[in-house]
Amino acid sequence: MDGEDVAALVIDNGSGMCKAGFAGDDAPRAVFPSIVGRPRHQGIMVGMGQKDSYVGDEAQSKRGILTLRYPIEHGIVTNWDDMEKIWHHTFYNELRVAPEEHPVLLTEAPMNPKSNREKMTQILFETFNVPAFYVSIQAVLSLYSSGRTTGIVLDSGDGVTHVVPIYAGFSLPHAILRIDLAGRDLTDYLMKILSERGYTFSTTAEREIVRDIKEKLCYVALDFDQELQTSSQSSAIEKSYELPDGQVITIGNERFRAPEVLFHPGPLGLEAAGIDQTTYNSIIKCDVDVRKELYGNIVMSGGTTMFPGIAERMQKEITALAPSSMKVKIIAPPERKYSVWIGGSILASLSTFQQMWISKQEYDESGPSIVHHKCF
């Protein structure tokens, strides 16, 4: 199979959103929610051409009559039947390609169980008949997309946050740390503190509104206590937001109180350390000789790192934790929401990468376990 003449497909399956497109492109063509919906009551829509399942935006818009499921929890696939439906939807409805004609690069969470990598490999080759396949760790791809091969990546999406130190292109597994605190939790927390102000959001539809408020209005304070004090004395930080029904609500210190839990997860009832302390803890778990390069290359990736002010705050907190003479540098590329996908697009289009693919022939000879020998 000669991969030169046909574009590879790159699919980044996140807990919240699936990003998919063609290698060599600078952004994913398709971005849709990683959800599968099934009708709550069989036969309720007879004669309406009812399908037995819906994926992505269509599932989201029909959620009133469906039971919604997220097949990826905290970055790890937990429901393979639903996952298969998401891949099917990606190929046939979103990208409109025949999977048997394109090499496919998938992404995986750090520390993804071995059995999961094998299952992924098996489904792609046996169900979708892909000619070639590869799987890459998400954080490593983010690092590549920033033009580096050594650094420490803070990757925070909708379902999970990982801190992954990488040296010369290889992740250092003993120092990878995971925090089960990400975008979904921030949305929940924002719902909670808005209800204290008298605005109640409870349904899934209202949850989407709060997610939008979070994405449009929230920011990270450089000095939280100072910001609280300032906001109590002036209305300068207050913003208004128009709800779909035309009602206008005002949001004040909630704008920075919600993302603050990334640094202090206490209010969520989590014992976990914040993203700053966790990044530091991961660096400390690495060999003393590589720490300087890690401190100087802290790369942020994922949608939950998109808050204004987050890089400056991170710089301040890590500098306070690091040895005094250490140069700390935070890299927060503007396209970091999609940097995992972009890294995959870069990798899969490199001429030097073409011999790295697992071919259908190799799979037929060795079976799913070949993924451990070829993808690391």
From Swiss-Prot:
Catalytic activities: ATP + H2O = ADP + phosphate + H(+)
Domain of life per record: Eukaryota
Species assigned in the record: Ogataea parapolymorpha (strain ATCC 26012 / BCRC 20466 / JCM 22074 / NRRL Y-7560 / DL-1)
Entries under InterPro entries matching the protein: Actin, Actin/actin-like_CS, Actin_CS, ATPase_NBD
Name of the protein described by the UniProt record: Actin
Keywords assigned by UniProt, alphabetized: ATP-binding, Cytoplasm, Cytoskeleton, Hydrolase, Nucleotide-binding
One GO CC term, this protein: cytoskeleton
SUPFAM superfamilies cross-referenced by the UniProt entry: Actin-like ATPase domain
Protein localization: Cytoplasm, Cytoskeleton
